[in-house]
Amino acid sequence: GKSTMLRAIGGIFSADEGTIDLHGHSISLLSIGVGFQKKLTGRENILLSGMVLGFEEDYIRERMNDIIEFSELGEFIDRPVKTYSSGMYSKLAFAITAILETEIILIDEVLSVGDAKFKKKSFKKMKSLISGENRTVLIVSHSIDTLQKLCTRVIWLHDGKLKMDGDPKEVLTAYDEFMSE
């Protein structure tokens, strides 16, 4: 349900009922298995992904080296994405999302992917994206620790319905107690 909701907000799925209005904001979905053309190289996918997100080609090319550097893919950037491990795939997806900085970022359980060094770097970048800008970041995660450290508001959905909405500490404590029953 939660991943489906993110994909509907991101425009990948259409909602069965109701409407989703993004008020013209650019949006990116960071989710394992979504968004890349497997036969294209990482570099080609950066360009394609950026254009799909609505960015001008010149802007994407200006940010290309920053994306490649952040992704830590080195020479693999010029190999087809189909040859990437899931960690490499996630690093590239995160780097594109983090460096191009859309107004709305949707994150589906991918902050825990990659080696310890990359996780730390990603967490730091995500923290700066959330706190330093006028941006909406929607995270689907079961990691209470991650949500406590990153979020200023938490919404708990259960069986497709809103269970609780508010302060991260309050909502996550209630969630943890509920899951322990």
Label every PLM stretch briefly.
Residues 165-166:
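ABC ATPase "signature
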Residues 28, 47, 59-76:
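Conserved ABC ATPase "signature" region
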